[in-house]
Swiss-Prot record:
Cleaved signal peptide residues: none
Record protein name field: Small ribosomal subunit protein uS5
Molecular function as annotated in GO: rRNA binding; structural constituent of ribosome
Record GO cellular component, one term: small ribosomal subunit
Similarity comment text for this entry: Belongs to the universal ribosomal protein uS5 family.
Complex and partners: Part of the 30S ribosomal subunit. Contacts proteins S4 and S8.
Keyword Cytoplasm tagged: no
Domain comment in the entry: The N-terminal domain interacts with the head of the 30S subunit; the C-terminal domain interacts with the body and contacts protein S4. The interaction surface between S4 and S5 is involved in control of translational fidelity.
Length: 173
């Protein structure tokens, strides 16, 4: 197993994706004979151009759990449209008791966000954003709420298509 791991990690670096580990938890399974220790990892992967994915992995050892999480994150990537390194409009996401609010920011603002949200923004290529989390600070729920908000964001072209108008008509009023 140990000989195989460096090869897998080098393959992951060849595809040009950015990887960030958000959390590693030690978990315990209680059985008749005692306790079985393991590890659970939460990671995000992004291409720096709007594609981002989240993955969870569990294993008896930390590196194996992280590797499983990275592979799952690569499989579960979603595309979010960005505008000059930020999002198009204010958006809110919910998951469980976690609520995240995001707002676009002008160039030079940077990433103003805490904890797990910052990692998601960094790997997906957002350079300027203001984000705030309320409620639960559980990293799993915060990342899911962030993904909920990002997937619910729309471009002006999508809004215009839904309304049967042109983009110019939307901003004319």
């Amino acid at each position: 197993m140990a000989k195989f791991q460096p090869k897998v990690q080098s393959e992951g670096q060849d595809d040009g994706l950015r990887e960030k580990m958000i959390a590693v938890n030690r978990v315990t399974k209680v059985v008749k004979g005692g306790r079985i220790l393991g590890f659970a990892a939460l990671t995000v992967v992004g291409d720096g151009d709007g594609r981002v994915g989240m993955g969870k992995g569990k294993s008896k050892e930390v590196p194996a759990a992280v590797q499983k999480a990275m592979e799952e994150a690569r499989r579960n990537m979603v595309k979010v449209s960005l505008k000059n390194g930020t999002i198009h409009h204010n958006v809110t996401g919910h998951h469980g008791a976690a609520v995240v609010m995001m707002a676009p920011a002008p160039k030079g603002t940077g990433i103003i966000a805490g904890g797990p949200m910052r990692a998601v923004f960094e790997v997906m290529g957002i350079t300027d954003i203001v984000a705030k989390s309320h409620g639960s600070s559980n990293p799993y729920n915060m990342v899911r709420a962030t993904f909920d908000a990002l997937t619910n964001s729309t471009t002006p072209a999508e809004v215009a298509a839904k309304r049967g108008k042109t983009v110019e008509d939307l901003f004319a009023a």
